[in-house]
Amino acid sequence: MDEENKPKNKKQKITIKANTQASSKLLLKREYIVEQKQKPLLLNKIKFQEPLTLTKEIEATPKPQAKETKNIKIKKTAAKIVSTNIIKLGEQDKKNKGKILTVSNISKSLGGKPILKNISFSLNHGQILGLLGPNGAGKSTLFNLVVGKIFPDRGEIKLNNEVINELPIHKRALKGISLLEQHKGLFGSMTAYENLYAILELHIEDKNKIETKISQLLSYFGLQYLVNVKANNMSGGEYKKISTLQRICNKDIKVLLLDEPMAALDPLSISSIKKFILELREMGLSVIITDHNFFAIQDILDNCLIIRDGNVMVEGPPRTIIKDEKAIKYYLGTGFKI
């Protein structure tokens, strides 16, 4: 072909091969993933079957209309399938707006010392409940009672109207109660994909189903860019998000207990985690959060308990608590005014 007949405007194609040993944050940003043709984000043990291709236009040249339309339809359809499958689960669960968890007159002593005294509260389907109080108030003990690490001396715990007092922790997990503790989570030398895969392969034999599940979760929460990032290289907020996905990925979770999910995070990460928790609720989960900082989380809470010395001192929606002098006294002490 002579020079005159050659197209004047061409796309410059840059081919980047994935390197699992190097940082993959830049490689796997969303705009790069969108450029993968007809390929969902399904990885085989972090090994790409073919190099990713990023196309950069130097001068705008229209593509053939039919081809462009086809690609767009494929991408939109794939994204829609991933999102809709998960959202439908949440919508189905949220139809039941009654109580999913009921704690009635629970008491517990440890080493002869009363820790909890006649605690009662309930959690509705799709609700976010805040459990607040100073150190030693009994928040962790209450979490351990709900999840089944320890058993109450008196009182009753119900999940969907079924008494679960005597059920051990693994049976409560099978019924849909999961706890994410503050200092426990991922294998630091493993990527987000590997950490999720390690849990899922214990429950799912089909490799393709595992990869599809991982793709759905990461896509739904916009975390595809972390797929090849090792846990040790994640920010605090990213680490907690992947840790949470690890808890909910392999079972039908109904109640998720989060132990101080905002601890040691900067303001931007706190904002990101709060958005993440709201997205968990949209999936149909009911969430209980422990924290010391009422003002950091009050905007995402539906209801709140303030515990002091093993007793529920205040219960109510945050907008009511923040205006109540008695509540502020129990939470922040005397002499404090907002």
Segments and roles (model prediction):
Residues 230-234:
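Conserved ABC ATPase signature
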